[in-house]
């Protein structure tokens, strides 16, 4: 997935965890401070939000519990949008919905009622 500077983000949400998925493997394919300056993957732990990209660099593998509230803070919000410019790249290996299966639910937005 590509989160372009000036526009890329992902709303805070949780992903389903169950027999179809117990962990979300994420491959960091860019480095904060080189490919983008601000924003990044955030997770909530014990009521506090942490920016994961402050601790990883390109090539690192992140193993995350999808049930943790998470999202992507807007990447370089001070920059103008440029699809072919800088930004944040990641490889995501999650299974959020098995096609044709009602056993695996979809992601749940944090602001859902």
Regions flagged by a language model, labelled:
Residues 21, 32, 36-113:
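Catalytic core of Fe(II)/2-oxoglutarate
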């Amino acid at each position: 997935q590509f989160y372009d500077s000036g526009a890329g983000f992902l709303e805070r949400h949780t992903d389903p965890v169950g027999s179809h998925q117990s962990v979300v493997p994420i491959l960091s394919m860019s480095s904060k401070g080189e490919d983008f300056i601000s924003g990044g993957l955030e997770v909530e732990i014990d009521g506090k939000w942490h920016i994961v990209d402050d601790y990883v660099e390109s090539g690192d593998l992140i193993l995350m519990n999808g049930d943790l509230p998470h999202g992507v803070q807007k990447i370089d919000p001070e920059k103008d949008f440029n699809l072919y410019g800088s930004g944040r790249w990641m490889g995501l290996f999650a299974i959020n919905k098995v096609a044709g299966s009602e056993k695996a639910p979809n992601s749940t937005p944090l602001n859902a009622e």
